Amino acid sequence: MGPRVRVGVIVGVHGVRGAVRIKSFTEDPADIGFYSPVENEAGSIKYRLKVTGEVKGLVIATLDGIGDRDAAEALKGTELWVARERLPRLAEDEFLYSDLIGLVAEGVDGKRLGIVKAVADYGAGDVLDIKLEPKGDMMVPFTQASVPEVDIAGGRLVVVPPVYAPDENEEKSGGA
């Protein structure tokens, strides 16, 4: 089995006939239906899914063989995966979150800062969560200005660290 990509996770049930609520990780949430059948994380079970609607940012779908609420409830937390080759080809400046996680984050001076541990979208755009070395974390907007270079093959990206304004509640150094 080649590389796979997580495209969603079942987060709950919808109604009494076995429909599920899915948090989709596809660009357009309803597009998860185009990748049917999807697999569980182990790759041991395939699910044919049919998108029937969307509610509050979640996809409502039916799965073949799941016909009641109890069966759907048992799937809560199941991650849905597809083979990477089934995804559309990306533009040169597009990346999957899974491609970014684990990359070495370097400063513009080439100094190693840490490792990308997560990518999140809080509504205002993608944000890289970088585990700094030797300790700490840094959140960086995933924009051309903040991340001017991404080298997937080389396993690295270049980060312009954000400049933080001092917290007005912080103690002033050098004071009495």
UniProtKB/Swiss-Prot annotation:
Q: What's this chain's function?
A: An accessory protein needed during the final step in the assembly of 30S ribosomal subunit, possibly for assembly of the head region. Essential for efficient processing of 16S rRNA. May be needed both before and after RbfA during the maturation of 16S rRNA. It has affinity for free ribosomal 30S subunits but not for 70S ribosomes.
Record remark on domains: The PRC barrel domain binds ribosomal protein uS19.
Please report which protein family the annotation says this sequence is part of.
Belongs to the RimM family.
Species of origin: Paramagnetospirillum magneticum (strain ATCC 700264 / AMB-1) (Magnetospirillum magneticum)
Q: Does the keyword Ribonucleoprotein apply?
A: no
Q: Name one Pfam family in it.
A: PRC_RimM
Name of the protein: Ribosome maturation factor RimM
Return the InterPro entries for the record.
PRC_barrel-like_sf, PRC_RimM, RimM, RimM_N, RimM_N_sf, Transl_B-barrel_sf
Q: Where is the PRC barrel domain?
A: 92-165
Q: Name one GO cellular component term.
A: ribosome
SUPFAM superfamilies (UniProt xref): PRC-barrel domain, Translation proteins
Q: Which PANTHER family match?
A: RIBOSOME MATURATION FACTOR RIMM
An annotated GO BP: rRNA processing
Q: How does it assemble?
A: Binds ribosomal protein uS19.
Question: Which compartment or compartments is the protein found in?
Answer: Cytoplasm
